Amino acid sequence: INSASADAAINLLPENFIVKAIDRTGPAVVRINTERLVTDTSSQELLLKELFGIDTLPRQERKEVLSGQGSGFIIDADGVLLTNAHVVDKADKVTVTLKDGRVFNGKVQGVDELTDLAVVKIDPKGQNLPIAPLGDSAKLKVGDWAIAVGNPLGLDNTVTIGIISTLDRSAAKVGIRDKRIDFLQTDAAINPGNSGGPLLNAEGEVIGINTAIRADANGIGFAIPINKAKSLESYLAEGKKVPHPYIGIGMVNLTPEAAKENNNDPNSQYGIIPEVNGILIVNVVKSSPAQKAGLRRGDVVVAVNDNKVSDGQDLQAIVENTGVNQSLKLKIQRGDSLLDLKVETAQMENLS
């Protein structure tokens, strides 16, 4: 086959969906550089104070600029960006660089640490901005295409591809128990610097925000579903605190086998507990909704709103989805007795 025939054959190949997806959304993906000024006291001074109680004056304080980098994407013509909270939280300076080379100062409008979401605003000053189209993460199925875009390790405009490996992977399973989010799992390569960048579907719509990886494995990355981000974006853009309900308990999952093992241990810290499937309350926060409702350490939650529960992550999700100042009916196993208690959720900011 001659070169002319080869060129003609190549020209007949259809443009693949990845190219189309990146052409559609890639220009709206940005690099975010951050700077944070920190003051550090010399280690020698701290050692003297710790060992001998010597408090030297004046303090030899060093000011150091910590730099960070991540990704984000523009969602409207006014310059609103979505990214991860851990990319921009506590930053003193935020610089946003577009794919076309334009550079803007960014202002952090709002941060929500519990979902690791943040909104950053740039001033387009009359310039046109590329906008990333947002998809519907509720329509995703395991096996759907997933395209990750961002700036891993400082390598701008990097594209990797995989599939949606799992839906609704709990934060606890990911290994970040302090978050209130169920993640999309993907095998599209995600690396440091990808954080805050978009995960796209085959049409180039944003279906997630790349957030985390498992350091001990390859091909396991996690993204916040875009529907979650859409539901919170208005709070963050306006600088409002995102409402997160809580009831105020510490808990562990309980099985009859685990309860029996506990009850056979004379040194058990929980005493005798019911040998049932449920969620064992290991502590109750003072002045919390749970305490006000009469919940106690050693109680076992076996149902919520007449639906059986046996996993603390499920209970946490129910509380989160219920909203603030709403009632939940908990069925409690306390010793040999079954009790119905009503708990009214409260805003987590009231926890102090």
Predicted regions, residues:
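C-terminal recognition in membrane/secretory proteostasis and scaffolding
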Residues: 1, 7-10, 20, 71, ...
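Glycine-biased strand-turn-strand hairpin within the trypsin-fold
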Residues: 2-81, 89-91, 102, 117, ...
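Conserved active-site neighborhood of the chymotrypsin/trypsin-like protease fold
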Residues: 12, 67-69, 74-157, 217, ...
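Residue-level recognition of beta-strand microenvironments
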Residues: 32-35, 77, 90, 109-111, ...
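Catalytic nucleophile loop of clan PA
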Residues: 73-74, 189-209
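Short pre-catalytic strand/loop immediately N-terminal to key active-site residues, enriched for Gly-Thr
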Residues: 130-135, 184-191
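Chymotrypsin/trypsin-fold serine protease catalytic domain
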Residues: 151-178
